[in-house]
Curated annotation (Swiss-Prot):
The keyword DNA damage does not apply. One of its GO terms (biological process) is queuosine biosynthetic process. Its EC number is 6.3.4.20. It comes from Salmonella newport (strain SL254). Belongs to the QueC family. Zn(2+) binds at residues 188, 197, 200, 203. Binds 1 zinc ion per subunit. This is 7-cyano-7-deazaguanine synthase. Catalyzes the ATP-dependent conversion of 7-carboxy-7-deazaguanine (CDG) to 7-cyano-7-deazaguanine (preQ(0)). ATP binds at residues 8-18. Disulfide bonds: none annotated. InterPro entries: QueC, Rossmann-like_a/b/a_fold.
Amino acid sequence: MKRAVVVFSGGQDSTTCLAQARHQYDEVHCVTFDYGQRHRAEIDVARDLALKLGARAHKVLDVTLLNELAVSSLTRDSIPVPDYEPNADGIPNTFVPGRNILFLTLAAIYAYQVKAEAVITGVCETDFSGYPDCRDEFVKALNHAVNLGMAKDIRFETPLMWIDKAETWALADYWGQLDLVREETLTCYNGIKGDGCGHCAACNLRANGLNHYLSNKAAVMAAMKQKTGLR
């Protein structure tokens, strides 16, 4: 039996990954992390979506220690989430240092327990928002280290790594989940489901990607299939 673990926030990217995993694996588990995030409404959204999309199990892990260690606008109410700035330089204040290091490591430990062959994460280098822990070289390096540390061959899969947001919408549509992803996921840094607040960087990327896909469906779908190898 093929098993996978999805790092699952209930947002656009991880929900698209879950929709795909349900077609590619016999059994899919979801792991969601409670780190005291500003947008912690995503935890309830993730619970609902994991059930709706047929996950075999859904674990919510308490990692609130990360909130104490990592200073970010997503972990401190006193630090405002900035509006989207198209030409902003540097790492944004929404970056949570160590988040993906912790999430992927814990997901791999869970995968070891349930005998899963893969950990799936929705990180993306094309639209990575300046986050260093969304880069392909980071994921591959951590995967190598985790496998050495556990003497186990668990793959870190990144199905969205080389596609952009419009193509991610196309992928959701390919698996028949465009409306669900649009209406029921939570991507917004301010914790608003669906189309979100419309001002933060996460909402901007999501909206621009959706608009581009809806305006150029055939071309974007073709590009997505070419990059992912889907038919």
